[in-house]
C-alpha cells in the first residue's frame, strides 16, 4: 500500500506500479487526523521537494501549491480492513510526528519496522520529537544504512522506490548484498539522516 497526496507524484506513482498488481496506491497523505491542507511545492525542482510546513522564514521559496487530503492511518486501515502491517516507510519533509500520531493503534498491535527521514533541524539534544514518540511506544532500536546516501534522480519518487527496495532486502533477507549493512545508532549525531530504521526488536540478533 502506498500513499501519495500530490497530483504529479501520484501520476508518477501509478506509472511505477502499473505492472505490479500487488501494490495499491491511494491519493492521500497521512496525518494525525483527517483533514484538507495546503501542500507547497517548487515548480522548477524535483517533484518530491514539497512541504505542508510552509514558513515565510524558510530558505526555500515555494512558488506553487495545491490542496491535498490527509487521513489518519489507523482510521483508514480499519475502514479498509487492512491489517498485519509489518513495514512502514515515511518521507514527509519534517511532518513525521503527525504521521506517527495517526498510527498509534497500528504500531501497538502490529509492531512494524518503521523507516523515516530525520532532518537536522528537528534534532535537539541528540534526539527529536519523532524519535521520542517511537521510544515511548517501545521502539528502542534505531539503525542507519550507507545506502541511504541520496543518488541523483530526476524525480525524488524514483529515489524513494530504490531506497525502499534496498532497505526491505537488508532487513528481511539476511544474506542480501552484505556490502550494505544496517548500523545501530547508539547516539544520534546532529546531522541529516536520510533514513532511520526503527524497530521494537533488535534486527541484528
Q: What are these model-predicted stretches?
A:
Residues 1-205:
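Phosphate/nucleotide-binding beta-alpha loop and adjacent structural elements of enzyme active sites
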Amino acid at each position: 500500500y502506498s500513499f501519495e497526496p500530490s497530483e504529479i507524484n501520484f501520476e508518477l506513482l501509478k506509472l511505477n506500479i502499473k505492472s505490479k498488481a500487488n501494490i495499491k496506491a491511494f491519493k492521500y497523505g497521512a496525518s494525525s487526523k483527517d483533514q484538507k491542507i495546503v501542500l507547497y511545492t517548487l515548480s522548477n525542482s524535483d517533484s518530491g521537494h514539497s512541504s505542508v510546513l510552509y514558513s515565510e522564514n524558510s530558505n526555500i521559496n515555494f512558488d506553487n501549491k495545491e490542496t491535498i487530503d490527509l487521513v489518519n492511518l489507523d482510521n483508514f486501515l480499519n475502514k479498509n480492513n487492512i491489517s498485519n502491517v509489518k513495514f512502514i516507510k515515511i518521507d514527509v519533509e519534517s511532518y513525521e510526528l503527525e504521521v506517527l500520531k495517526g498510527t498509534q493503534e497500528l504500531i501497538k498491535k502490529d509492531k512494524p519496522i518503521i523507516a523515516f527521514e530525520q532532518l537536522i533541524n528537528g534534532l535537539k539534544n541528540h534526539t527529536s520529537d519523532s524519535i521520542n514518540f517511537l521510544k515511548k511506544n517501545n521502539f528502542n532500536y534505531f539503525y542507519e544504512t550507507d545506502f541511504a546516501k541520496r543518488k541523483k534522480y530526476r524525480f525524488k519518487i524514483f529515489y524513494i522506490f530504490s531506497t525502499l527496495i534496498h532497505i526491505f532486502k537488508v532487513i528481511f533477507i539476511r544474506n542480501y548484498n552484505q556490502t550494505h549493512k544496517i548500523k545501530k545508532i547508539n547516539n544520534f549525531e546532529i546531522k541529516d539522516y536520510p533514513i532511520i530504521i526503527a524497530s521494537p526488536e533488535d534486527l541484528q540478533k
